[in-house]
Amino acid sequence: MSHTMQRRHYVDIYGPTVGDRVRLGDTGLIAEVERDHTSYGDECKFGGGKVLRDRMGQMPGASNDEALDCVITNALIVDWTGVYKADIGIKRGRIAAIGKAGNPRVMAGVTPGMIVGVTTEVIAGEGHIVTAGGVDAHIHFICPQQGYEALASGVTTFVGGGTGPATGTNATTCTPGARHISLMLQATDVLPLNIGLTGKGNTSSPEGLLEQVRAGAVGLKLHEDWGTTPPAIDCCLSFAEHEDIQVTLHTDTLNESGYVDDSIAAFKGRTIHSYHSEGAGGGHAPDILRICGEPNVIPSSTNPTRPYTVNTLDEHLDMLMVCHHLDRNIPEDVAFAESRIRGETIAAEDILHDLGAISIISSDSQAMGRVGEVITRTWQTAHKMRDQRGRLPEEQGDNDNFRIRRYVAKYTINPAIAHGMSHEIGSVEPGKLADLVLWRPQMFGVRPELVIKGGLIAWAQMGDPNASIPTPQPYYMRPMFGSLGAAVGETSIAFVSSRAMDEGSIRRLDLKKRLSAVRRCRKIGKADMRLNNTLLPITVDPETYEVRAGGELLRCDPAKILPLAQRYSLF
């Protein structure tokens, strides 16, 4: 017998369904449910008197192999692939299927492989948003505490380099040399994150590069502080082509060894991930943004300039002096710093992100960027652009779904593709590692409710451990069992080069994390960036710093007020 429910009542019990709209935090961004894979009347719901009981939603007789390990019920999935509602099935640490879970003997439309049995755990996803774990592809490994800060924000993968608070690491994302790479892989083996380390690529002769890749480096970093000259760029890219690894780039701010055209010429059309394709982070001054118009360049920017606000310029000078070991008493150092901080190009960076011309947002952790704010700054940028530029022409219906999908891709699937990791992570799709983040809509982008790492809860909002229920104050993000002991190795990946895997030398490190080789890092480019593949000719006036893309002047005002800020946090 059918039963009709009021929409508000249905949403309260099972979460939003097709046509319902959800505001993301206190932003102006509205997500609308595009489709619903659950079956009306047969929804999964756990609790006293609810559906997931024996011989109802839970199928008796289902073996451990047949049943899911865990099911997230009635989740609103926000991913580059769409904005939709579904159950998410997890098996052996991976997303087994997305659709309708339950007992196929008594329920309609149960998706194959989504049986709920006596061996199945449940996470109530109704009323929550689920996104893929974030991928931060610009990490300075300055201190291990970054990992926990990032995980608490919803980031589950680090790509970058460093050896701790060494002067070189404070400025550059390089783990130089085979010994450092081995030691850092061992040191980060206890962090509940997927890890990929980049070696140092600044050399005009290839000796020394092979040893780093053999030790497990997933890429090589070219940084101006080590000398990013055209010969070094050419040498590093030539080596990377042979090894199928990514090259990350921070170009020459001072234009001592050449200008932006010289760096572009040194690329010779080869794939490169250009860090700081932005308004103030470094690289050829003042026109590094031109690099965003090259088809072989995967451009990214970092969160200190995300988005452009009335405080951005003042904050940057002090940060820059510290991060790059500069001296206020040396005029040339001050001139170097000031040349990198330009309001006009920072404003253009906002718009280039909104156009999909800059493909990735990352942190630049403790080296001008904040490791725990990648996700927050991304959504603040999206809100600012929605507020200043209005709806995107690609939008359909009374929602911001396309813009939402574009921005979530910047810190999930696109960095995963750029670094050859998208076969494992980066999206909410079957077969991927179950790195998933649950958010209450009102806290979206600021504070996750649960962070699931490889199918097990690693971090979560939790109340007083001595309380009689989980929710009494103080209620804040705390480490959970997925971040402890041997579970870390079972639920996380150490990404390494294919050479390290093939030669087998990496196994002598006895890492507890599963090893996975990066793949298809070469022969890709802007066109491979999901929803962020806009290619326009970009010019920067050397006198006024005005930026034009496709002939259009890119100009916007700095924000005075942002969402996801002091309404949620004391500091």
Swiss-Prot record:
Q: Which InterPro entries match?
A: Amidohydro-rel, Metal-dep_hydrolase_composite, Metal_Hydrolase, Urease_alpha_N_dom, Urease_alpha_subunit, Urease_AS, Urease_asu, Urease_asu_c
The annotated pathway is: Nitrogen metabolism; urea degradation; CO(2) and NH(3) from urea (urease route): step 1/1
Cofactor binding annotation: Binds 2 nickel ions per subunit.
Q: What cofactor is this protein dependent on?
A: Ni cation
Q: Which GO terms describe its molecular function?
A: nickel cation binding; urease activity
Q: Which Pfam families match?
A: Amidohydro_1, Urease_alpha
State where substrate binds: H223
User: Which principal EC class is assigned to this enzyme?
Assistant: hydrolase
Q: What keywords are annotated for this sequence in UniProt? A: Cytoplasm, Hydrolase, Metal-binding, Nickel
EC identifiers of the protein: 3.5.1.5
Q: Where does Ni(2+) 2 bind?
A: K221, H250, H276
Q: Which residues carry this modification: N6-carboxylysine?
A: K221
Is this entry keyworded Mitochondrion?
no
- Protein family: Belongs to the metallo-dependent hydrolases superfamily. Urease alpha subunit family.
Matching PANTHER family: UREASE
Protein name per its UniProtKB record = Urease subunit alpha
Q: What is this organism's lineage?
A: Bacteria, Pseudomonadati, Myxococcota, Polyangia, Polyangiales
